[in-house]
Amino acid sequence: MTYETILVERDQRVGIITLNRPQALNALNSQVMNEVTSAATELDDDPDIGAIIITGSAKAFAAGADIKEMADLTFADAFTADFFATWGKLAAVRTPTIAAVAGYALGGGCELAMMCDVLIAADTAKFGQPEIKLGVLPGMGGSQRLTRAIGKAKAMDLILTGRTMDAAEAERSGLVSRVVPADDLLTEARATATTISQMSASAARMAKEAVNRAFESSLSEGLLYERRLFHSAFATEDQSEGMAAFIEKRAPQFTHR
């Protein structure tokens, strides 16, 4: 499939989606949203892909939603079109996803990064939800995912003031998985994605599902759900291979079945 606002690359078992609207600091208009979602879904459906990286440019991962596109919307327009609903499909991708963030990740850009399972930030990254400065509030999950990631007090601080935080503060707050020098960002993201992609695909998807369930259920429900997924893993060929390889002191050869 041909895309106009993103670049898509396959590198062995890793899929890489690069936002490519440099003239607009990768602002997320409807076309970008649709293309990112379409590419992620396509990669998710590919059995030869075991991890997906989403990244932007050195200056901006994504500087937010495209304000020019939204400025003249009425309530009826936004509500009827269910604006931003497209991103729900991206969040539902089962393949592990990695956000590789350099530069600005603001508003929708921060929300896009938070939809990913692992968030690796360059030391140049800046995060924030500045929507309040425009007379609105986060609409792509910012108020929900940010609060779950860094807690109510910190989320309130960022959302109500619209201020940004640098990569170091984001790491201390628990928003990002790790911070690396900007020149090493894609190397680190590719290495992490390659490591994940070499694991059993079914086990990786189950693990992702179990962790996500922790935010959506009580502890007892989450423990039961995890246990059922653990039991299910014993129906896979990869479980037999993984445990046999451990006993035989060799590297496992997963077939993702």
Curated annotation (Swiss-Prot):
GO terms for molecular function: enoyl-CoA hydratase activity. It comes from Mycobacterium tuberculosis (strain ATCC 25618 / H37Rv). Keywords: Fatty acid metabolism, Lipid metabolism, Lyase. Could possibly oxidize fatty acids using specific components. The keyword Nucleotide-binding does not apply. Its EC number is 4.2.1.17. PROSITE patterns: ENOYL_COA_HYDRATASE. It catalyses: a (3S)-3-hydroxyacyl-CoA = a (2E)-enoyl-CoA + H2O; a 4-saturated-(3S)-3-hydroxyacyl-CoA = a (3E)-enoyl-CoA + H2O. GO terms for cellular component: peptidoglycan-based cell wall; plasma membrane. InterPro entries: ClpP/crotonase-like_dom_sf (IPR029045), Enoyl-CoA_hyd/isom_CS (IPR018376), Enoyl-CoA_hydra/iso (IPR001753), Enoyl-CoA_hydra_C (IPR014748). One of its GO terms (biological process) is fatty acid beta-oxidation. This is Probable enoyl-CoA hydratase EchA8. It holds the Pfam family ECH_1. Gene3D superfamilies: 2-enoyl-CoA Hydratase, Chain A, domain 1, Lyase 2-enoyl-coa Hydratase, Chain A, domain 2. Belongs to the enoyl-CoA hydratase/isomerase family. It is an enzyme of class 4 (lyase).
